[in-house]
């Protein structure tokens, strides 16, 4: 009674049938975090790693709530997670026991692969998230028109969030899930509308990077939203800013529609190219579009 054993990184402890190895994993997601590996049953006790939101008695897909958990809880510390994954790769792991969520016993490669994707800030899927706020409905109308343009150009996935009404944590999760993000908001007190301000702050806090980003701004006199949004994301790494910015003066006009058309084309150029290539492969009439100089040789 009263005895304690202080372990260090790499320390081992024999419990008779079980042998434990302790591995420090600072900032995943607390400074003092360590994980424990039981070499007998090949179990990794992963602390906050591989956790998820949700009740254990609810049958649901692991990926969505685990992604939302990762981005919200651990997402800022991708480099630290990458270091932990390198250690995990040296172990024979057959069971993962996180502090939050179900025990993982099958298809562990799937979970580890997702953690590698998330912690390296690599887009998980091709697609476009459009996150917006609207005061009088004009920005919402612009977003609706813009989304239709994206869909018509073959974008494989378009996800839209009204940040004043939808789940902010889900919007944040999807911003990291997909490859491209469009932000649309109004100028507000020489800044941006509060819900958009909150959303972009969360993006920056969680190390948002390696994405293509486009901006749609609205304002009655002197729109500043695009400038403010870009400044807020200025410290984020590997952001590919679209050449086109949509600048709306209160309500959408033809110039704005042309700008949205240009932005949609810029976002969807690779999708358009893929669709054209597929269409050409499936076009049987192409067999008959043969240039001059073709001779038909027959034998008698």
List the predicted regions and their residue ranges.
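Catalytic core of the metallo-beta-lactamase
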Residues: 2-60
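Short gly/ser/thr-rich secondary-structure transition/capping motifs
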Residues: 3, 25-27, 113, 160-166
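Short hydrophobic segments within beta-strands
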Residues: 46, 99, 131-133, 216
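FMN-binding flavodoxin-like domain, especially the glycine-rich phosphate-binding loop
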Residues: 56-96, 100-103, 145-161, 171-277
């Amino acid at each position: 009674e009263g005895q304690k054993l202080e372990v260090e990184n790499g320390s081992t402890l024999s419990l008779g049938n079980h042998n434990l190895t302790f591995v420090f994993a600072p900032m995943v997601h607390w400074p003092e975090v360590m994980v424990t590996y039981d070499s007998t049953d090949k179990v990794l006790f992963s602390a906050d790693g591989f956790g998820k939101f949700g009740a254990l008695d609810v049958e649901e897909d692991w990926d969505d709530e685990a992604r939302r958990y990762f981005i919200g809880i651990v997402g800022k510390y991708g480099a630290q997670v990458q270091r932990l994954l390198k250690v995990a790769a040296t172990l024979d792991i057959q069971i993962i026991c996180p502090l939050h969520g179900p025990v993982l016993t099958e298809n562990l490669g799937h979970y580890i692969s997702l953690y590698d994707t998330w912690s390296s800030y690599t887009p998980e899927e091709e697609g476009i998230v459009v996150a917006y706020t609207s005061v009088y409905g004009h920005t919402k109308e612009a977003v609706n028109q813009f989304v239709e343009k994206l869909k018509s150009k073959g974008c494989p996935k378009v996800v839209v969030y009204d940040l004043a009404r939808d789940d902010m944590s889900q919007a944040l999760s999807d911003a990291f899930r997909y490859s491209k993000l469009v932000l649309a908001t109004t100028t507000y007190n020489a800044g941006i509308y509060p819900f958009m301000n909150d959303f972009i702050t969360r993006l920056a806090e969680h190390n948002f990077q390696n994405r293509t980003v486009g901006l749609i701004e609205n304002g009655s006199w002197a729109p500043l939203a695009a400038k403010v949004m870009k400044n807020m994301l200025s410290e984020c790494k590997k952001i590919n800013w679209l050449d086109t910015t949509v600048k709306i003066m209160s309500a959408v006009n033809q110039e704005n529609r042309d700008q949205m058309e240009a932005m949609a084309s810029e976002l969807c150029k690779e999708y358009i190219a893929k669709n054209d290539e597929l269409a050409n492969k499936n076009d049987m009439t192409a067999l008959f579009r043969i240039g001059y100089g073709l001779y038909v040789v027959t034998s008698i």
